[in-house]
Swiss-Prot record:
InterPro entries: Metal_Hydrolase, Pept_M19. The gene is sirJ. It comes from Leptosphaeria maculans. Coiled coil: none annotated. This is Dipeptidase sirJ. The lineage of its organism: Eukaryota, Fungi, Dikarya, Ascomycota, Pezizomycotina. The keyword Protease applies.
Length: 394
């Protein structure tokens, strides 16, 4: 395995990225704007200024020849999740903050229309790329963000969200996390199985990064649509709990899904301080040789970590990774799939499943809501409308 891509490979990488959009599966720029700039997007110029905080700004994205990215509208798990308590009312602040983050991303897209364009479909990604814009897709990072409500999931979809990670660092009402102290559902809960069906119906991509092995297995046995791991790596290269084991990767192949390799040093090697671009390449090659390059992508997690692996310092450095893949003799047709072709295919397949379910008249997942009227008032209403009461009895 070569140590540094030369100019020839960088030129070939640039040429490839002029033909095919590089789509990053997970980017936390919105989180750092919330943390450092308190969501005030007019205090700095994110398209022109130098030396801005973090791994991401528009100049870096352009230098990195980025064709599209999933912006994460991430909000942390509430404290109750840490003790496996999932009360509905405790998620109200989580839902509010998620809406704030979705709004932030949409405002950034509106503020920088020469560079960013909202994409909600696979064809929309290609359209944005052809128009010279960075296709901007939205994801949420954990179903704690929907507050135990499929109605909220649907509203997020209507706002443009196209993938939902099932868990973050803690369990929730739907599924177990890879990093929780103990499981509570042994994979998916009953509600979790219902929400998987709803996500298939809706056309929401299921993201299994952060989930436990049993959760991933349960989902892969149930889902009718391909899934993704938006920012994970291979357990067979480095045995970290956030990485994906071979048995799950083989199921992923059967599912026609996608694992998008992360740049997080702790996921990349046993020595995070020395984790490098070459370790990311090792993970990509490992998965490609195990299950095929049709199932590998890139999910950096930029701005979701203090420091990325050496050699991939920020979004401007993506061409170095692409050049290294070419230098390691991965056929350019496969590299095109890795950088974005696979994600576009998966998204199109998810859309097709949703379309078929619509044709089959699969109904949306309804939920129990807090009672508005008591039985006595319902009886008064029923007495006022005897015809309706008679129809209800049929």
């Amino acid at each position: 395995m070569k140590s540094e891509p030369g100019n020839e490979f960088l030129e070939r990488a640039a040429n490839l990225l002029s033909r095919v959009p590089l789509i990053d599966g997970h980017n936390d720029w919105a989180n750092i704007i919330r943390g450092y700039y308190s969501n005030k997007i007019h205090v700095r110029n994110f398209s022109r200024e130098e030396s801005l905080v973090g791994h991401v700004d528009i100049k870096k994205l352009r230098k990195g020849l980025v064709g599209g990215t999933f912006w994460s509208a991430y909000v942390d798990c509430p404290a109750q999740d840490k003790i496996n308590v999932f009360n509905d009312d405790s998620y109200l602040e989580t839902i509010r903050e998620t809406l704030q983050q979705i709004d932030l991303i949409l405002r950034l897209i509106k503020k920088y229309p020469d560079d960013l364009e909202l994409a909600t479909t696979s064809s929309g990604i290609l359209s944005s790329f052809q128009n010279g814009k960075i296709a901007s897709l939205l994801g949420i990072e954990g179903l704690h963000q929907i507050g135990n409500s499929p109605s909220v999931l649907r509203m997020f979809y209507n706002l443009g969200v196209r993938y939902a990670t099932l868990t973050h660092n803690h369990n929730n009402a739907y599924a177990d996390s890879a990093t929780a102290k103990t499981p509570v559902h042994n994979g998916l809960s009953i509600k979790g199985r219902a929400i998987i069906q709803e996500m298939n119906r809706l056309g929401m991509i299921i993201d299994l990064s952060h989930t436990s092995e049993q959760t991933a297995e349960d989902v892969l046995r149930q889902t009718r649509a391909p899934i993704i791991f938006s920012h994970s790596s291979a357990f067979g290269v480095h045995p970290h709990p956030r990485n994906v084991k071979d048995n799950i990767l083989h199921m992923l192949k059967s599912n026609k899904g996608l694992i998008m390799i992360s740049f997080v040093p702790e996921f990349s090697s046993a020595d995070p301080g020395l984790s490098s671009l070459m370790d990311v390449v090792k993970h990509i090659i490992y998965v490609g040789e195990l299950i095929g390059y049709d199932h590998v992508g890139i999910g950096s997690d930029f701005d979701g970590m203090a420091r990325a692996v050496l050699g991939l310092s920020d979004t401007s450095t993506f061409p170095r990774l692409v050049a290294e893949l070419i230098a390691n003799q991965i056929p350019e047709g496969d590299v095109e799939k890795i950088v974005g072709g696979n994600l576009i295919r998966v998204m199109g397949d998810v859309e097709a499943v949703a379309h078929r379910q619509c044709e089959d008249d699969i109904l949306e997942l309804e939920e129990e809501v807090k009672p508005l009227w008591d039985d006595a008032f319902k009886a008064k209403i029923a007495a006022a409308y005897p015809e309706a009461l008679a129809l209800n009895a049929l």
